[in-house]
Structures are given as C-alpha cells and as structure tokens.
Amino acid sequence: MQTRKPEHGPGVHDAAWRETKTAILLRMTLQPSATDPHPDLPICFAHPLDSDSEKLTTPEPNCLELPGRGPEIIYRTGLATLSNSEEFGYQLAAAADNRGFFTAQAQAYICDGQSYNWTIHRRHFASFVPILDFVHAAEHVHQAAHALGEDGERWVTCCWQGQVSQVLTEMTECLNRLTPPPDPSVEQEHPWCVLHRELGYLKNNQERMDYPRYRCEGLPLTSSPIESWVKQLNQRVKGSEKFWNDDENGESILHLRNAWLGDDEALQKHLANRPGQPYGRPSNRTQSCKAA
C-alpha cells in the first residue's frame, strides 16, 4: 500500500510503498480418501495463461467443475499488517490459537514459497502440514520449460503426480548442458540463469510438494483464497490517489478492512457494541455501583 509521512501538513510527503503481510484462516470441509481422488492434471494448469493454449476453440472444463476438486471453505477470517515478518508470525499464531486451529482434526499451512513464510511455519505452525501452493509451483515449472523453448505440461504433470525428483533430475541435466553467460547478474533472463533460478526454487520447496498425499488427506493445494482476499483488501486500501499515514492510521485501515471481510462480522459487532454508540440500551452499571 502507498504511505505518506504524517504530521507534515496537507498533501503527500515522502510517499513510499509498504508491503502488507496478509494471511487468512480457513475452516474447510475434510474428505480423506484411500486413493488419489484426482490423479490427472487439471487442464487449467497445463499451460501458462499467456500461452496460445488459452485461445483454444474448444472450451475446456474449469478446475472448479472437476470431480474431487478438494475441500470447500466453510468459514474465513483474515489478518493484515504493516509489521515485519517476525511480528506478523506472532500475530498470526495468536489469531490461529484464538480460533482453535491448533486443535483442528487436520491442519495445513499453504503459501507461495517465500522464505519468511516457511520461517513462520517452523516457529509457530510446526504441527501443520506445509504445502507449496501448486499454482506457484506450476508457474515456476512453466518458466523453466519456457527458458528451454519447451512446453512445461509434462513437468507440471509430474509435479501434480508427486514425481518432483524426476523433474529436478531432468532440469539439472538440462542446466549442465547449457553454458552460463559471462555475467549472470546482468543477464538474468538468459536461459541458464532462468533455469538455475527455478531449479533452486523447486529444490528448496521439494519437501512441500507431495500433492498426491495432500489430496488423499483431503487438504487444499492452492493459496487461491488468499489471492482473492488480497484483491478484496486492496479494493479499499489501494488506488492511484490513496495514501495512508505511515503510522497507526495505515495499520488501522488494514485491520478495519479485514474485520469487514471476515465471516465473523468483527467490524459489525464492534460498531454495535462500542462505547457511545447511539442505538444501544443505556447501561445502569454506574448507578448500580453508586447504589452499592
């Protein structure tokens, strides 16, 4: 979100972009299965969105229309802050504990692969199954294949079916056949640089890509709900002319927006019960205290 320096008069002073840390806590249906309920790769993951495949004349089934598509959301609440990742981890753990997540029958922690997300997992959510969002995994695999001038569908299918080690082996062989540029730091889009970068991403997240097991356990595979939540959050806090004070005011608007979006109706409850609200019944607590 865009921020400005407070207490400097009208207008925008020292404009800057601040990263918001966002998470959602979901209660979802759980339907474990003895066998993989969906072993075949959904067509929506087979090709990147910017490829010619999206121009196919024959409509393909949507991922949401496929059988065994995974758990459904029952109840959602969220959390957003301008704090650093360490403080955010404690805030998220407190929110999860308040909602009873640490006693849930099944527990999953899904994110996009950023290192600080896994640090939060290790510190606060070690009992949760760590899952790399499959959409991000597929995106990185497609980028690696594109750098080689190939279609990434086969590699993405291997990842979907739990054969990540095979993909890593083949990528390593391809990388060894390429000649690195004289200065990799300058030519970051060189095929060798792209493949080296994507290979490192997948190696770092390999242990969190056992997707067949997650499907059998009835766990979700993607962080799509948080992407949707962030878009709804940004409808209020982002805009070409929106600047928030870089202090508690900017933090407050994030809390208010999350309270409005959550299924627990936290904002509505606060407005209905806040001190001085005009529609509540007057309290006789003061009179009772005086009488005592």
Language-model-derived ranges and their functions:
Residues 1-292:
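Catalytic center-proximal scaffold of phosphoryl-transfer enzymes
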